[in-house]
Curated annotation (Swiss-Prot):
<dbReference type="InterPro" id="IPR003736">
    <property type="entry name" value="PAAI_dom"/>
</dbReference>
<comment type="function">
    <text>Required for optimal enterobactin synthesis. Acts as a proofreading enzyme that prevents EntB misacylation by hydrolyzing the thioester bound existing between EntB and wrongly charged molecules.</text>
</comment>
<dbReference type="GO" id="GO:0005829">
    <property type="term" value="C:cytosol"/>
</dbReference>
<dbReference type="InterPro" id="IPR006683">
    <property type="entry name" value="Thioestr_dom"/>
</dbReference>
<comment type="similarity">
    <text>Belongs to the thioesterase PaaI family.</text>
</comment>
<keyword id="KW-0378">Hydrolase</keyword>
<dbReference type="GO" id="GO:0009239">
    <property type="term" value="P:enterobactin biosynthetic process"/>
</dbReference>
<dbReference type="InterPro" id="IPR029069">
    <property type="entry name" value="HotDog_dom_sf"/>
</dbReference>
<comment type="pathway">
    <text>Siderophore biosynthesis; enterobactin biosynthesis.</text>
</comment>
<keyword id="KW-0963">Cytoplasm</keyword>
<protein>
    <recommendedName>
        <fullName>Proofreading thioesterase EntH</fullName>
        <ecNumber>3.1.2.-</ecNumber>
    </recommendedName>
</protein>
<comment type="subunit">
    <text>Homotetramer. Dimer of dimers. Interacts specifically with the aryl carrier protein (ArCP) domain of EntB.</text>
</comment>
<dbReference type="InterPro" id="IPR026576">
    <property type="entry name" value="Thioesterase_EntH"/>
</dbReference>
<dbReference type="GO" id="GO:0061522">
    <property type="term" value="F:1,4-dihydroxy-2-naphthoyl-CoA thioesterase activity"/>
</dbReference>
<feature type="active site" description="Nucleophile or proton acceptor">
    <location>
        <position position="63"/>
    </location>
</feature>
<dbReference type="Pfam" id="PF03061">
    <property type="entry name" value="4HBT"/>
</dbReference>
């Protein structure tokens, strides 16, 4: 297991109360040895005006996953802040849920890079993101 902080899924989900994460319906669903996953509904909260998943909602899911994964890689007295987010949208999604899978690309002392891939309910890749974070403290 790569994580320096040891939290349960319930503890991770509790951090979302009264935040954008909760408003969008994002729920952490898996914390594996080197992976963090979450789901987000594709509904009125996350649609753009034409009834499709809003790219900003996809970006919010990606940044949520990458930032939390980054936090799990810090020690007491440290935190992470996002420095760059890149998202490539591959496929439109109009309903159901999307699942985000976050994996590390680089875990340095001062910066991290995360790859977050979003999948629709049929397991098709709909968005690929990369998040850079800086370790503070």
């Amino acid at each position: 297991m790569i994580w320096k902080r040891h939290l349960t899924l319930d503890e991770l989900n509790a951090t979302s109360q009264n935040t954008l994460v909760a408003h969008l319906g994002i729920v952490y669903t898996r914390l594996g040895d080197d992976v963090l996953e979450a789901e987000m509904p594709v509904d009125a909260r996350t649609h753009q005006p034409f009834g499709l998943l809003h790219g900003g909602a996809s970006a919010a899911l990606a940044e949520t996953l990458g930032s939390m994964a980054g936090y799990l890689m810090t020690r007491d007295g440290q935190c992470v802040v996002g420095t760059e987010l890149n998202a490539t949208h591959h496929r439109a999604v109009s309903q159901g849920k999307v699942r985000g899978v976050c994996l590390p690309l680089h875990l340095g002392r001062q910066n991290q890079s995360w790859e977050i891939t979003l999948f629709d309910e049929q397991g098709r890749r709909c968005c690929t993101c990369r998040l850079g974070t800086a370790v503070m403290g």
